[in-house]
C-alpha cells in the first residue's frame, strides 16, 4: 500500500514526509507514554524527535477499515504546506499498524476555548483573538480549495479539528474524510455523505439543493464561525423553539435583520463590531443553496474588509432537526433520524458517513416538517 502512496507523492510534490520504522515511533513516544487525546480515527500521543522537537503521533484505529483514512491524510498533507494547515512530518506502515506524525500544537484544539466555561482552567480568548483565528482558518481552507495542484475538500471542518500552536495560530487538521479532485471540475461525486453532525452541508443529503462541491466546506466554516463568534454551540435541542438557545443562527439572523444589537458578555463595543462581522459572514456561508454561498477566497475578503460594507443576506438559513442522522449501518446502508432529545444526548463530534439515496426523485423536506425551506425565485449568488 505504501508504494502506491509514495509513487503518488513523488510524482506530484517535492515535499515528502518521512517514513519511520515502528521501533522509531515507539522510541519517540517513549512507549506511547503521554496520551494527548482520542479523535475520530485514533489515539494521539506526544512524542519527541531526535532534534528535540515535539510531535503529535496518531495511531490509527484498526476499525478504520482498509486504510482509506491513512491514504487520505498522506495524500493530502504529504503534498502541501501552509501556515494554517497542520504539517505532516512523517508516517509509519508496519502490517496493521498505521501511524501519522504531525507537528505538535501546544494549545490543543479550538473547541475547548470557545465552549469552555468561565471557571475552566483554559485561557480565555477575546473576540479579536477569535477573529484572527477565524481569518486564519478561512485562509487555510481557501488554500486547500485553490492553492494546490488538486482541489482538496476537507469535509470535516469543526472546532475539534482546528489546532492552535503556542501563538494561537490555527491549523486545520484531520484529513481522514478529505477528497481530492481536479481544480477544473466544479462538482465532486460521492457515494456517501460525510462529515460531523451539525456541520454537514444540506446538499450532502438533498440533491435538488445543489451539487456537492467545495461549497460544502464553506457551509461547515459558516457553522464554525457562528460558534466562534457566539462562544457557544449552534444547537440546543432541549431549548424552546425560536429562542437564542435553540438554534443560534436563526436567532442571530432575526436579531440582525430587525436591526437589533447582539450582546456578548464582557465584550467591548469594538469587539461587538468584530463579532457582528463574523456572524454576517457566517450567515452567508450557511445559505442552503451552494450557489448562494461565497467562495473561501471571498470569505477572506469579507473578513478582512469593513463590517459596514457587508451586505446582509436576505435568505434565512434553513435547518431540519428531524433530518439529522442518528447512526449509520455500513452493512445494510440504512440510517435513522434523531429526535430533539436524542440529538441533545448525542456527541457532536460523532463522524457519520451516510449512503446517498439511489432514488433520483429524492427531495427536500415538505412544509409539514419542523421548518419549511423558503427559496425565492430570485437570489443573490456567488458564482465564479
Label each residue range with its predicted role.
Residues 217:
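Conserved catalytic-loop aspartate of Hanks-type protein kinases
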Residues 1-6, 55, 243, 262-384:
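Intrinsically disordered, low-complexity cytosolic regulatory tails
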Residues 89-96, 106:
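Short beta-strand micro-motifs within the conserved protein kinase catalytic domain, predominantly
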Residues 139-152:
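Protein kinase catalytic-loop region centered on the HRD/HxD motif
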Residues 70-75:
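Regulatory alphaC helix of protein kinase catalytic domains
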Residues 45-62, 87:
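Glycine-rich ATP phosphate-binding loop
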Amino acid at each position: 500500500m505504501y508504494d502506491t502512496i509514495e509513487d503518488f507523492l513523488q510524482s506530484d510534490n517535492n515535499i515528502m514526509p518521512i517514513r519511520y520504522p515502528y521501533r522509531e515511533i515507539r522510541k519517540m513516544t517513549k512507549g506511547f507514554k503521554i496520551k494527548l487525546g482520542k479523535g475520530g480515527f485514533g489515539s494521539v500521543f506526544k512524542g519527541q524527535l531526535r532534534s528535540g522537537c515535539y510531535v503529535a503521533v496518531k495511531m490509527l484505529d484498526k476499525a478504520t477499515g482498509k486504510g482509506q483514512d491513512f491514504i487520505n491524510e498522506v495524500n493530502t498533507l504529504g503534498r502541501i504546506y501552509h501556515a494554517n494547515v497542520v504539517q505532516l512530518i512523517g508516517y509509519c506502515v508496519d502490517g496493521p499498524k498505521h501511524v501519522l506524525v504531525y507537528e505538535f500544537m501546544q494549545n490543543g484544539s479550538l473547541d475547548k476555548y470557545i465552549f469552555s466555561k468561565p471557571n475552566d482552567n483554559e485561557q480565555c480568548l477575546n473576540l479579536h483573538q477569535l477573529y484572527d483565528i477565524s481569518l486564519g482558518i478561512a485562509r487555510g481552507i481557501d488554500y486547500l480549495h485553490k492553492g494546490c495542484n488538486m482541489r482538496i475538500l476537507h469535509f470535516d471542518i469543526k472546532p475539534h479539528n482546528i489546532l492552535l500552536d503556542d501563538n494561537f495560530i490555527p491549523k486545520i487538521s484531520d484529513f481522514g474524510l478529505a477528497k481530492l479532485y481536479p481544480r477544473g471540475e466544479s462538482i465532486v461525486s460521492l457515494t456517501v455523505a460525510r462529515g460531523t453532525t451539525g456541520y454537514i452541508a444540506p446538499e450532502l443529503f438533498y440533491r435538488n439543493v445543489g451539487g456537492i462541491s467545495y461549497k460544502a466546506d464553506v457551509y461547515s466554516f459558516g457553522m464554525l464561525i457562528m460558534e466562534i463568534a457566539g462562544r457557544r454551540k449552534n444547537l440546543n435541542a432541549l431549548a424552546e423553539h425560536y429562542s437564542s438557545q435553540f438554534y443560534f443562527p436563526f436567532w442571530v439572523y432575526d436579531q440582525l435583520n430587525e436591526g437589533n444589537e447582539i450582546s456578548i458578555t464582557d465584550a467591548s463595543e469594538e469587539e461587538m463590531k468584530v463579532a457582528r462581522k463574523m456572524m454576517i459572514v457566517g450567515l452567508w456561508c450557511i445559505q442552503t443553496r451552494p450557489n448562494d454561498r461565497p467562495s473561501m477566497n471571498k470569505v477572506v475578503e469579507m473578513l478582512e474588509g469593513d463590517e459596514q460594507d457587508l451586505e446582509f443576506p436576505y435568505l434565512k438559513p434553513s435547518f431540519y432537526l428531524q433530518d439529522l442522522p442518528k447512526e449509520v449501518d455500513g452493512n445494510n446502508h440504512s440510517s435513522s433520524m434523531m429526535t430533539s432529545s436524542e440529538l441533545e444526548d448525542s456527541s457532536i463530534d460523532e463522524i457519520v458517513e451516510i449512503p446517498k439515496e439511489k432514488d433520483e426523485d429524492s427531495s427536500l423536506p415538505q412544509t409539514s416538517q419542523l421548518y419549511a425551506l423558503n427559496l425565492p425565485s430570485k437570489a443573490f449568488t456567488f458564482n465564479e
